[in-house]
């Protein structure tokens, strides 16, 4: 491991894995702080970590707790983070602020990628990436996740972009950023709660070993930047597009009526969709995160073989 700043605390299990060149999978924490209510959030986080351990890798949930940048959380720390009422949601722009001000915060995809690369963690599992929001023509609301994927060398396993986004424009920005977008056993881009879409995916690979080999060639070419592995939600857990799209449209109309913008957009939409779907969206969300964690662990193991 490289020397890390004094405000960074690496969990013993993660430190040992990195020092012995064992597979590690990074996990973000906005899904804990902003994605679902307590105690669902902590139960989900523990279950996802167990999925990774069961596949032979070490989980490293990344977060900021009271100004300390945590790479890997113990059970007590996970519970403490899950109970924080006013946690920040941090990206590249404000991760330093949260640490310097002694705040607690959930890390977005972008912030988690930054910390993972700093620690030498190659693979990261999340639910869905951020992207271009609908109505971008007037709001210019584009997630920093997309530019981070273009600049930071981490493999991100996700169920595509969150379906609340303008997914075609999100795919265009990823292409502009030079991000390798790989469909795992799929020819269309997964749409988060739905396993497929009408958008063709640029690249397809059918095994963790193939993804690992692709990354090794990218390393040899010194390309830099990230890879997005789009992993469809399991068929038994998906919500049909015609159903989920109705919930999304209702939630977005309410959001516009209430003039909600900025970082409040995604948490508001996810909460309203949870309410409109009577909890079904949350159950699907948990299932797809677990599915992504399993694939991420398999890729991490393959990279170290």
UniProtKB/Swiss-Prot annotation:
Presence of keyword RNA-binding: no
Enzymatic reactions: D-ribose 5-phosphate + uracil = psi-UMP + H2O
Cofactor note: Binds 1 Mn(2+) ion per subunit.
SUPFAM superfamilies, A to Z: Indigoidine synthase A-like
GO biological process, one term: nucleobase catabolic process
Cited InterPro entries: Indigdn_synthA-like (IPR022830), PsuG (IPR007342)
Keyword Manganese: yes
Catalytic residues as annotated in Swiss-Prot or TrEMBL: 28, 162
Name of the protein in its database record: Pseudouridine-5'-phosphate glycosidase
Provenance organism: Dinoroseobacter shibae (strain DSM 16493 / NCIMB 14021 / DFL 12)
Lineage of the organism: Bacteria, Pseudomonadati, Pseudomonadota, Alphaproteobacteria, Rhodobacterales
